[in-house]
Amino acid sequence: MARVKRSLNAKKKRRVVLSQAKGYRGQRSRLYRKAKEQMLHSMTYAYRDRKDRKGQFRRLWIQRINAASRAHGLTYNRFMQGLKAAGIEVDRRMLAELAVNDAAAFAALVETAKKAIPAPSESAA
């Protein structure tokens, strides 16, 4: 059997890795082994952070809703409790959007939530 020389395949593989590593500092963009290792780490971080981004946005939405509802005299927890009791199913993303861009609509939701919150029971004392 003839011997297979991997010249073209190896060069292509290295060229792809080095082109993906453009923009890295120092040896990580010029040397194949360092670039390959950095690419593996970069892809791991990218995968992890794509998952983490969803939680970061949820935290941001909750902060915005909390700030806006406190301006109307209600904490985030009580506001969400009131919305659930009133049967209003608006997700946090839309609530945060309303809080930032449409204060009148958000104020109406807060008033609805205030009316729907059950009175605290006296038997707990």
Swiss-Prot record:
Gene Ontology biological-process annotations: ribosomal large subunit assembly; translation
Presence of keyword Cell membrane: no
Superkingdom per UniProt: Bacteria
Gene3D superfamilies for the chain: 6.10.160.10, Ribosomal protein L20
Keywords, sorted A to Z: Ribonucleoprotein, Ribosomal protein, RNA-binding, rRNA-binding
Record Pfam families: Ribosomal_L20 (PF00453)
Entries under PROSITE patterns matching the protein: RIBOSOMAL_L20 (PS00937)
InterPro entries listed in its UniProt record: Ribosomal_bL20 (IPR005813), RIBOSOMAL_L20_CS (IPR049946), Ribosomal_protein_bL20_C (IPR035566)
Gene Ontology cellular component annotations, sorted alphabetically: ribonucleoprotein complex; ribosome
GO molecular function: rRNA binding; structural constituent of ribosome
Record-stated family: Belongs to the bacterial ribosomal protein bL20 family.
Described function: Binds directly to 23S ribosomal RNA and is necessary for the in vitro assembly process of the 50S ribosomal subunit. It is not involved in the protein synthesizing functions of that subunit.
This protein's name: Large ribosomal subunit protein bL20
Species assigned in the record: Thermobifida fusca (strain YX)
Native organism taxonomy: Bacteria, Bacillati, Actinomycetota, Actinomycetes, Streptosporangiales
